[in-house]
Amino acid sequence: MKFLVIRKPRAGAIIQPTSQLIRAQKEGLLSAIKRGEADCAYAFVGGGGISILNANSTEEVNQRLFSSPLGFFYDFEVRPLADYGQFMDTVAQALEAREKQSR
């Protein structure tokens, strides 16, 4: 399964991340891309960013997010992703079924 992860710096964090934590986060995410655990990662100008993770469950995503070096410095929004072609086929099939019922 694929998950869109949007991360934003957590406002009011008591402890600020160090340069060492920033580098560890970078290396961890780039390594995840090389291993196929993530498809991509992009930063937002001004802080935060997005990535697309590959995982077998929501629990796996949660574990990976909060075990990352900056896991407690971000607020996360996680959205499961569907294959576009399959999604649109399902919508079209549902509409076709509804159209047949209304005839």
What is the predicted function of each stretch?
Residues 1-103:
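Conserved, structured core segments of small domains
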